[in-house]
């Protein structure tokens, strides 16, 4: 069993790196197997097909992230009132904890989620929305509670604007922090970036 487990993890690790760098559409199974130094039959054995492999790569993060977000939001909703800042603040620690799933896990996860949209991976959005429906519904409910004036259409667009901002910021975090440190002669870390990001996202979601 050990060799199979090792092979499976190797495939996941290599696929993750290639998907993040080149996207889902431009990464073939042969490219993955070549870099992982395994045969195509190994991918078929462990995952069946490329779509299942894509989902498995994301689910390494999601299975750690979603229960943690759910706990944070349940705690938030024990209160009678809260604002948009506090909704986004509930995501901070769960997202940061992804760095313990994989090195630089938070940025990698956000980049992969972004790839899911830009590469039109409809099956991936379906997988996330069905497997983690309860958590996503709680998140949507929390946003609505924090800003009840939003229409369904406004919520749709603003959530996707928010996602785009997060994906760009986290995926480019190293370059952005280096530029900021050079320009302002001030040390910047990931926590500082998130501290700046949360009020910006909250203001965008609550814009009149």
Map each language-model feature to its residues.
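Amphipathic alpha-helical segments used for helix-helix packing
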Residues: 90, 101-130, 174-178
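Hydrophobic/aromatic residues within well-ordered alpha-helical segments
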Residues: 50, 57, 61, 65, ...
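C-terminal peripheral helix-coil segments that are non-catalytic and often amphipathic
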Residues: 97, 130-208
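An amphipathic alpha-helix adjacent to DNA-recognition modules
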Residues: 8-13, 47-70, 74-77, 81, ...
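Short alpha-helical scaffolding segments that buttress acidic/His motifs in well-ordered protein cores
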Residues: 91, 95, 110-117, 162, ...
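Helix-turn-helix
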Residues: 10, 18-60
């Amino acid at each position: 069993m050990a060799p199979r487990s090792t092979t499976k993890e190797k495939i996941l690790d290599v696929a993750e790196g290639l998907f993040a760098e080149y996207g889902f559409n431009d990464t073939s199974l042969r490219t993955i197997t070549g870099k992982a130094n395994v045969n195509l039959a190994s991918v078929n054995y462990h995952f069946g097909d490329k779509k299942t492999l894509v989902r498995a790569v994301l689910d390494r993060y999601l299975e750690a992230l979603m229960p943690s977000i759910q706990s944070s939001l349940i705690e938030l909703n024990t209160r009678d009132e809260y604002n948009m800042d506090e909704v986004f603040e509930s995501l901070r620690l769960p997202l940061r904890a992804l760095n313990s799933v994989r090195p630089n896990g938070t940025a990698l996860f956000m980049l992969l989620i972004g790839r899911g949209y830009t590469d039109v991976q409809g099956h991936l959005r379906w997988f996330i929305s069905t497997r983690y429906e309860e958590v996503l519904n709680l998140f949507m409910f929390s946003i609505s509670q924090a800003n009840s004036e939003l229409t369904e259409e406004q919520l749709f667009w603003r959530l996707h604007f928010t996602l785009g901002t997060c994906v760009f910021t986290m995926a480019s975090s190293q370059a952005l922090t280096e530029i900021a440190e050079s320009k302002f002669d001030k040390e910047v870390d990931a926590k500082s970036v998130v501290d700046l990001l949360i009020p910006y996202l909250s203001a965008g979601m609550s814009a009149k």
